[in-house]
Amino acid sequence: MSDEITNGAAKPTEAISGPTFTIEKIYIKDVSFEAPNSPAVFNEAGQPELQLNLNQRVQRLNENAFELVLHVTLTCTAAGKTAYVVEVQQAGVFGLFGLDQHAIGVLLGTQCPNILFPYVRSLVSDLIQIGGFPPFYLQPINFDALYAETLRQRAQNEKEGSQISSQPAGNA
């Protein structure tokens, strides 16, 4: 029997055999809430307009670790004035061991953002309510479809690029 205490964290890399996907850390990288026209904007009548911008960035940290940052900006305008702007950068470090490049791309493009999105949704909703505005809940996002669309666009761009480079240039 051992007196060693573990905290439930993943075993060291040497102990991992076969393809493995791990969540190493989830954290807030950056967060901002601005309500530049409050308190006057609280009295504005009419339907507010919302604009959502979502993107993600991946950085390879080492051979088997990747940081994915999910960046969401939500802007609400009422009567032509900015009611609020919420920006959240939710990040995670993920371990991807024994996987080929295609599998790594799929996990980073689909599963990792799916893991981070509930944190983003909660943080955005909390910030808006704490800022004095009615609740707003980000709706689910189909990251599988977004990833498939990204691959389709990338293939289309490569196809167009190869067509352009195969055409004669200038007055040949």
From Swiss-Prot:
UniProt subcellular location: Cytoplasm
Keywords carried by this UniProt record: Chaperone, Cytoplasm, Protein transport, Translocation, Transport
GO biological process, alphabetically ordered: protein folding; protein tetramerization; protein transport
Chief place where the protein resides: cytoplasm
GO cellular component terms listed in the entry, alphabetical order: cytoplasm
Any GO MF annotation of the entry: unfolded protein binding
Pfam families xref list: SecB
Record note on quaternary structure: Homotetramer, a dimer of dimers. One homotetramer interacts with 1 SecA dimer.
Function: One of the proteins required for the normal export of preproteins out of the cell cytoplasm. It is a molecular chaperone that binds to a subset of precursor proteins, maintaining them in a translocation-competent state. It also specifically binds to its receptor SecA.
NCBIfam families named in the record: PRK05751.1-2 (NF004391), PRK05751.1-4 (NF004393), secB (TIGR00809)
Similarity remark: Belongs to the SecB family.
Protein name: Protein-export protein SecB
Gene name as annotated: secB
